[in-house]
Amino acid sequence: MALFSAYALAFSLLMIPLILYILRIGRRESGLPPGPSTLPLVGNLHQLPHGGLHLQFTAWAKEFGGIFSLKFGPGTVIVATSPRAVRELIDQKSASTSDRPPSHFSNVITGGNNIGFARYSDYWRRGRRVMHSMLTKKACVNHLTIQRAEASQLMYDYLVEPKEFVAHGQRYANSVITSILAGTRSPHHTSPLVTAFFQMQHEWTHLLTPGAHPPVDMVPFLKYIPGSWKQICAKMKVSQEELYGGMIDACAKRVERGIRNGCFLEGELENKDVDRGLLRGMCSALMEGGSDSTSIYLQSFILMLVAHPEVQAKARAEIDSVVGLDRLPDIEDMDNLPYVSAVIKEVLRLRPITALGAPHYSTQPEVVDGYVIPKNSMIFMNQWGMLHDPDSYDQPESFMPERFLTSPFGTKPGADDTGRSKDIYFGGGRRICVGMHFGQNSLAITSMYLIWAFNLTNAIDPQTKNPIPVDINEYDISLNTIPKPFKCDFQVRSEEHKRMVENAFAEARQVFAPFEQD
């Protein structure tokens, strides 16, 4: 009996440190930014909503300040909502905050070959350097011909099949990037490259949305528990290889046949420093960044114009005064279209493409605003909270393009703009969107064309003959900020505008020809 008691005592003494260690898991360490109270083991995981994470982060920012912390099990999450904190953490300390968090899902699906989700490594730096050479502000001038031509087809598609306006925007965004990247375009919204990409992207976005799947990177043992996400990953691995690998193979076969059109992959296939894995990683990053963001913006842009006819009329009057009625607008006109520029910026402010952006990850401990940012912390830029802050914006939930006519940031007089960036919609630091200039050109061209060619109105209910209302607050917001389905009418402004849209599309066929040779 005495021997048993001795063993029990020894066992208890050995277990005490283990129990104390387990109880410390999930607790907020000293020196971290403040945040909501935690529970042992889980930290703040139990407080995460199934949807609307950006709203919860914004509510916590109001309570705990412009930088706060969360505990996801043993892991630390830092959320920066104030521009000052974002600038210091993401821009000024970019040498140690440019990594991406470990992503089991991404690794299983891509084998590590995705520049957008790649760790801060030589692989990422090589891919970023090659993509940057294709997408500098100067290099993007060379892509304008394709962007204009594809935008001409977009207007024609709106003209002849307006009810499919969402699909037309997806076709445009997809075809522009595949033409420049892989030398092949999509002439119709049902073209295989379009349908395959957006179906795959829908599943990919859902899988990566925080809260939509088990946090296997924060709680590793969860990856061994059966779940539907494993079947989704296996399916997506095949789909991504078929899509991106197929694009690379198709380009290589054209080159072998002596057919070239100057696309990006043609040069890189002959670059001995670029292997297939890096090519695939660049294809996925450019496709996912270029196709999704532009098509989502177009949906929000159309919704805002339908809901605010007075804004549409004012923007149209400005375009008419600068462009006239005998030609389509062009990118050079943007310097003389301050109100149109303000409309574009206000769409991006009110409904940023991503509410939280892709998370960063710290590789070294840092100190920001007197708080410790530990090594291996996941870092979110709360773009939604930043762009909807009532201390910075008058009526932040209202669509008011005029705010950008009096401030480059759209902020109200007296607002603290320290650290604020005009390019926050594209991310920050060394991970800022490599296609930013290309994307800005696409948004400008398509926005000008739409306002110039069409009057966007509410659809008419065939039963009541009354306008069908739209609601600018009806959005599905997960990883991306996407309007829920809505109806509208595209009314071409005149027979002359119709003729010019048709002529522009006819002339664009010469531009399309080299990209329709598969």
Curated annotation (Swiss-Prot):
Function: Cytochrome P450 monooxygenase, part of the gene cluster that mediates the biosynthesis of melleolides, a range of antifungal and phytotoxic polyketide derivatives composed of an orsellinic acid (OA) moiety esterified to various sesquiterpene alcohols. The first step in melleolides biosynthesis is performed by the delta(6)-protoilludene synthase PRO1 which catalyzes the cyclization of farnesyl diphosphate to protoilludene. The orsellinic acid synthase armB produces OA by condensing acetyl-CoA with 3 malonyl-CoA units in a three-round chain elongation reaction folowed by a C2-C7 ring closure.
Entry annotated with the keyword DNA-binding: no
One GO MF term attached to the UniProt entry: monooxygenase activity
Name of this protein: Cytochrome P450 monooxygenase ARMGADRAFT_1018417
Note: Armillaria species are both devastating forest pathogens and some of the largest and oldest terrestrial organisms on Earth. They forage for hosts and achieve immense colony sizes via rhizomorphs, root-like multicellular structures of clonal dispersal. One genetic Armillaria gallica individual localized in Michigan's Upper Peninsula stands out as exceptionally large, covering hundreds of tree root systems over approximately 75 hectares of the forest floor. Based on observed growth rates of the fungus, the minimum age of this large individual can be estimated as 2500 years.
Matches recorded under CDD domains: CYP64-like
Highest taxon above the source species: Eukaryota
PANTHER family: CYTOCHROME P450 MONOOXYGENASE ALNH-RELATED (PTHR46300:SF2), P450, PUTATIVE (EUROFUNG)-RELATED-RELATED (PTHR46300)
Sites where a glycan is attached: 455
Biotechnology note: Melleolide sesquiterpene aryl esters are cytotoxic secondary products with anti-cancer potential. Armillaridin shows therapeutic and radiosensitizing effects on human esophageal cancer cells. Armillaridin induces autophagy-associated cell death in human chronic myelogenous leukemia as well as of hepatocellular carcinoma cells. Armillaridin can also inhibit the differentiation and activation of human macrophages and thus might have potential to be developed as a biological response modifier for inflammatory diseases.
Swiss-Prot/TrEMBL keywords: Glycoprotein, Heme, Iron, Membrane, Metal-binding, Monooxygenase, Oxidoreductase, Transmembrane, Transmembrane helix
Topology in membrane: Single-pass membrane protein
Organism field: Armillaria gallica
EC identifiers of the protein: 1.-.-.-
Binding positions (heme): 433
GO CC, alphabetical: membrane
EC top class, as a word: oxidoreductase
Involved pathway(s): Secondary metabolite biosynthesis
